[in-house]
């Protein structure tokens, strides 16, 4: 099992728009079996910059994660939801952990 985190540092005041988009994505991801354990988190305090959003999910294998990611990102509905999201994000990264 693996834990994947997509971490985005949003522009000031734009984290709400990204939360809205991720919530719109969830039903589409669920259609392909991708969001069993997915959750959206935002920063409260600590080492991350303000306006940080984290999308976290577990996957049984990295191959399955990559296949489902390709499948959802080729969906025109997903493309419409994510259109222009770079206007809301300053930077980001992906973290992948093996669950022991």
Locate each region found by the language model.
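Absolute protein N-terminus
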Residues: 1-2, 100
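Short, well-ordered beta-strand segments in beta-rich or mixed alpha/beta enzyme
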Residues: 2-9, 39-72
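Short, surface-exposed ligand-recognition loops at beta-strand->loop->(often short) alpha-helix junctions
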Residues: 10-18
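An amphipathic, aromatic/His-enriched active-site/gating alpha helix that lines ligand/cofactor pockets
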Residues: 21-39, 58-95
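Short, solvent-exposed coil/turn elements at secondary-structure transition points
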Residues: 44, 97-100
């Amino acid at each position: 099992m693996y834990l994947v985190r997509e971490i985005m540092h949003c522009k000031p005041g734009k984290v709400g728009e990204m939360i809205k988009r991720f919530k719109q994505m969830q039903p589409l991801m669920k259609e392909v079996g991708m969001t069993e354990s997915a959750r959206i988190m935002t920063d409260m305090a600590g080492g991350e910059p303000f306006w940080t959003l984290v999308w976290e999910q577990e996957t049984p294998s990295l191959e399955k994660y990559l296949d489902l990611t390709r499948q959802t990102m080729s969906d025109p509905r997903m493309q419409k939801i994510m259109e222009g999201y770079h206007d809301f994000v300053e930077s980001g990264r992906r973290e992948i952990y093996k669950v022991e």
